[in-house]
């Protein structure tokens, strides 16, 4: 039987002007609750979302990794446009070295035009962003595995780039992918394939496309871990779960806007079809602070039942 793993997507936005001490106390309470049960901590990588407070992803995750050595950690997912790929390789290698091998490199092509424009980044068409991501992955892999990395691409280039200490072991590379080109890229370069807030009906179609992409590049689909990331609100009753989740979580799910919302029994029922399709890792955004009901029920009832 495949073991099911949970990861916690820590709140990075909607802080509601929370004082630092309150936020850190709430976060520490949550991490203490899931320690030994959840395997990992994750954070989104966005710079802004309207007028909401937003923590920067790499800085925050480095802080968390230093304080909580019992967890693996990663992003859901890094926007490749925000940082030069050679710098990402260097930062990731450093984190892997200092953390003792706990870093997972989650990365994607980027999508939020608002934050690109606001922070002065060019926002090229999706095709270009996917091509940039492919070059970024080649550079990162080169710098992690070769004595000195050299790469000449259309968008990025490095020459004799020296990245020491080398990350050991190599961090798994997780790519968030839905479209045909991204699925092909994932099949070629990734160790993990991640989807976010996707219904099981849509996921079933994506799995067919993903497995076809793997065969096209000569790779066994079973070599690539399948993960799902998104919202989860769990409570003793479905009505209570809707109240806790509020407008932030979608209780009336659709193909591309899906969250787990309901009682422990319902959450288990919703997760099992994904597990049957090969998912063994769920990264869950669990409703923010200060309400920890979801985490308590996931630890006490849902995860044990899935691994029974």
Show which residues each predicted segment covers.
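N-terminal small/glycine-rich loop or linker at the start of catalytic domains
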Residues: 1-18, 70, 111-119, 152-170, ...
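Internal, glycine-rich beta/alpha segment that forms the wall or movable "lid"
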Residues: 2-4, 84-189, 204-223
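Hydrophobic faces of well-ordered beta-strands that scaffold small-molecule active sites
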Residues: 6-10, 41-43, 73-75, 103-107, ...
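Short, acidic/polar
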Residues: 20-34, 88-91, 176-185, 260-273
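Acidic (Asp/Glu)-rich catalytic clusters
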Residues: 32-36, 61-70, 92, 96-102, ...
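Alpha-helix-loop-beta-strand connector modules within alpha/beta enzyme cores
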Residues: 54-75, 132-139, 295-308
